[in-house]
Every structure is written in structure tokens, then in C-alpha cells.
Swiss-Prot record:
Protein name, as recorded: Putative F-box protein At2g33200
Domain called F-box: residue spans: 6-53
Coiled-coil ranges from the UniProt annotation: none
Origin: domain of life: Eukaryota
InterPro entries: F-box-like_dom_sf (IPR036047), F-box_BR-signaling (IPR050942), F-box_dom (IPR001810), KIB1-4_b-propeller (IPR005174)
Gene3D superfamilies from the UniProt entry: 1.20.1280.50
Signal peptide: none
PANTHER family xrefs: F-BOX DOMAIN-CONTAINING PROTEIN, OS07G0183000 PROTEIN-RELATED
UniProt xrefs under CDD domains: F-box_SF
Amino acid sequence: MSRTRYDWSKLCHDILRLILESLHYKDYHRARTVCSNWYTASTTCKRPLYPWRIKFNKISTSLFDPREDKIHEIQHPGIEFSDRNVLASCSNWFLMVDSGLEFYLLNAFTRERINLPSMESSILGKERLEKEVAWKHFIERTDIISTKKQACLWINERTGDYVVAWSIKQHYLFTYKKGDDSWLNLEGTKCVSMALNKDYKLYVYALDNSIKIFDLYGEFPSEIVEENPYRNHPFSFRFVSKPEEHAWKQVVAITNSGEVLMIVSLKGLEDKRLFYIYKMDFGSCNWERVDSLGGEMLIFGHGVTIRAPILDINGLGIKSDSICFRGDDLWPLSQLFIPITQPMCGVFDLATSTITWPKSLDASVLKSFWFVPGHA
């Protein structure tokens, strides 16, 4: 007698939702990648979004869930993280690069890997031709992990579509999306900071203080000019700051409603290290400081705000109207203006202008990052 065979991918969403909501967080993120039906069902699950921390060890990762106060260890056989650097993240995915400019995407939970085209022919061949120097003298390994680079990533985990943007030394800005033959160069755009949203729109804060918007959806990137309300209204911190305030880093960010924000890491009175938020008043076209993120929260440098838990998670400062950051995002303590490596990630409370330092996962800030599982 033959046994009845069931197609688990076709379970009704009500049953799938019950199954998914009963799973541990790590298993939940693996299960939602089984098929498109399971992923769609997972989007209806009532699981809160909040930042985790990840530490890249030699051949493994440590994922810290602040709500459960638990660390999950995941082995990555065949990957040597000491030779690789994290450039950006989106949901469960990280944009990685090695010293040879080989790029790939890595899923923190499933260990799935997506290889991207090498950047060497795009950057380094051009540089050899123009300056007749070996590529290693143009891009050193330290440049890849320094503040001279910017990158962002967006990925649709249901369809597998993704888009990546990467800039180095404020000189080159490249984009690549699934289906492209190679990296594309947005020539003439000197990028200080950038943000990428689900509509394939790339927001670039440029060296001349202007904010440019590029549409990456078509065959080739195109700049949006007429419909860019920020194009002729540059943001300059020195025009909105007080004499005792000095900027360390400035990044652009996009809210869930589509508003553009400028986030500034700075040193204030008595050397207090702060974060300020600015948005443009469309009536006056002036940039004005605001005191909150409208109940959302932000990981500094990630480019997009996220829905946030209203109440503090386990006293770690993770809540609405807070900014998660890494130690090198803060104004450096050194009088020599050299960033001092902080041994941990922190959280800045916009309401009180105070910093909470969660317990450290490791002494190496260069291998420890914030990310938001399930947020894309």
C-alpha cells in the first residue's frame, strides 16, 4: 500500500505561520528560505525587529540576540574571515570583500553564498592605464576597511533579487545588481555616504554637500534630477552647527516613509560625543535639526531606519529613537585625531544624549557589527 506524499511547500499560510512562529529565531530564519511560499508566510509572522550583533571569528560567527541574551555560534567551513571584511548588511545578508577585491554576499544563518564579479578589472585596470601603477599601491588592504569606503546592500529574500553599491576614496562609485554582466561605474560622483532602498533608489551624499538620487532599476543607472527635491539644497554641517560643535562623520539615511535624513556624529561642548539628526523643511528648504526618529531606530551608516521596540530591550538601550553604532563611528578620544578602537558596539539615546555600552563580544571592533535579521 502506497503512502500519501505531502508537498510541504504548499501548506496553507495559517499552518505555516503557526509552525514558523514556534521556531527558535535561528531555525526561523533558515526555514523562511525553504521556498517562496514559506517566505511569504514568514512576512505575516509577528516577530519583532531589533538589532543583533555579529562577530566574525576565524572560521565561524557569533550571533548575539539581545532579547534572549544568548549567543549563537555558526561554523563556516572553508571561509577564512581574517582575510575578509564586511562592507554592508541587509536583513540576514552581509556584503563581504577580501584583499583581492573579490566580493560576495553571505547569509549569516543559512551560510548561503552569492559570488559577485571581481572588482579588479573595473577599478584596477583603469588605474593602471591612467597612472601606470600597480593596483596594490592604489588600494591597500587598510583602505578597504577604512572610512574611505562606503557601501550599501539591498536584497529581496523572496525573489533573490539584490543590488549593491560600493565607493572607495570618494573617487569611484560602482553599482551591481542581480542580472548585470559587470559592475557599473557612476562616473563623476564623489560619494561621502549613501543609502539604498527597496525601490532601487540610491541616495548619495556627495563631496560638494549635495544629495543625488540614482535609479538603479533599468539596464543602466540614471540620475533623478527633476524629481529630486534635495538636489539644489545641499547639507553643510558648518552652516547649522555651533562654534563648539565639530563633525566626525556624516551619513545619509532614508526613513520608512521615504524622508531623507542627515545623521552627524560629532563632538560637542566639553568634548561630549553626540549624534544629531537633520531633515529638510520643504517650506523653507532649510535643513533643521530634529530630536527623534519618529519612533523608529537606526544603525549608523546602514542608510535606512527600522521599526523599533518601544521599550528598552534588557537595559541595552535598544529601543525607539536610538542609534546603534560601532566604536569608530564616534569622535575619537585621541588628541592626535587618530581613531581609537573601541572594544564594543554602543547605543545612543536621542532623548537623553547618553550612550549605553552593551557587554563586549570581543576586543576587535573591526570584526563586530550590528545587523537586523529579517529587515529588508
